[in-house]
């Protein structure tokens, strides 16, 4: 509403709320009981009056003569003039005897207007953010109802400064009707846990089960959540490991867990993990430019993973994997074999050397028996003689006779 000035005060004082000025002359000098008969509709407060107050005064006239009005509307004998700054009432009631009443400086000819069409003209000096549109009135003799007064406002009202709407004026064309929460339904049927057609035990592989869960959750959503985690860490500057996004999963519907999903049997809830991963730009080439990809993992309790046949049985060991005990036993056996092989080779070499040095076995035996005596008789002999005698004696003892 425009600020209240003297002209608006004049209109509000002379015209009671709820009735247009065309019946003003009929109740100026009439008693109070006749007012109810003139206005059959309930009265409205002054804030519902559709005409804003212009800076100039309005002129009221009847269309009894076909003269052209001047710039200030020269009135005749059957018209009255309301001064702009006076609070007095009009003197005579003859000027409002006609049914055709217009406001403004320019009045159209009465012959060119049909009785059923009436226009509302506003003076040119009115310039503001709001403008009144020309509307057609169907019942000129009766007072305007609240619905009529509500329709007088234009649906296209532009204001440079946003302001809170008046509690009395309701404009449904300007307010955006947001959809209610009940009308928005999720793709899962309003959050109901619907069992999946595929049993998780049929996958028999954690990789295929993880891919199925990723397809149900949505790769775009996972990428967006991981990107938000990246930006949050960059903004806060928190060091640490790479961000990991965790999604609690229901293995009944193969979707993200909701309150309608059944309670899990185990304490740890199955979770789908998404984390950044460095991958080569060209598959199969480890050396070269890298790109950032998304890796996925599945966190399950051991009992549930075993029930879904995602873990190998305890007895069956994969090919190529050996226990530590077996490895130690094999090492011991190889060490013993190597020692035996080296012992036999050393014995063979020593026997060959003895055969070459002593052409006759009788002489060799005699010389070996005499060597200890020589060692005892000559204690100053070198250590090489004693070593040689010891080695030869041990060889003779071990060699077959």
Curated annotation (Swiss-Prot):
Residues 83-93, 129-147 have a biased composition (Low complexity). Residues 69-80, 148-186, 357-368 have a biased composition (Polar residues). InterPro entries: DUF4679. Residues 69-93, 129-191, 357-401 are annotated as: Disordered. Coiled coil: none annotated. This is Proline-rich protein 30. The lineage of its organism: Eukaryota, Metazoa, Chordata, Craniata, Vertebrata.
